[in-house]
């Protein structure tokens, strides 16, 4: 979800999304605002849409729906700066936050170590975030690390909400595979 684009986020919730990833959350105050905007009363102040896909398009009382949706919908905050990592414990302590997700690519960029996902400073950031998440009963998450040597390191540390890849990369790999196959069928047409 684009940072701060709550209208888009709530539209996604109304249309059946069971979680929202909000990027660049650097402080507990920002995390509280995310919860306030994405959780339904009494936890937050997200507006309840009408009859939606969560209930098979059947009606449900707003109280029943709010409680069920607050329990089912994941509120995922991305920690993508050294400031966010320094504030990880305070962010994790915010009620209604379900997942702390390190955006490793942006974190590396902010640290001045673009693409160095195995750097010890990044590992330290994961240790900090995972400890904070565990202390407050949240899921520690990892995004942006798809290297099959580095990814297991952070999973072994305790990352449990793991983005295993990107849709665009999966599509590009599939397209490259198919293109290679087609070129083999018609070697003279390259």
What do the predicted segments below correspond to?
Residues 1-190:
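Expand to "…catalyze enediolate/carbanion chemistry for C-C bond making/breaking, isomerization
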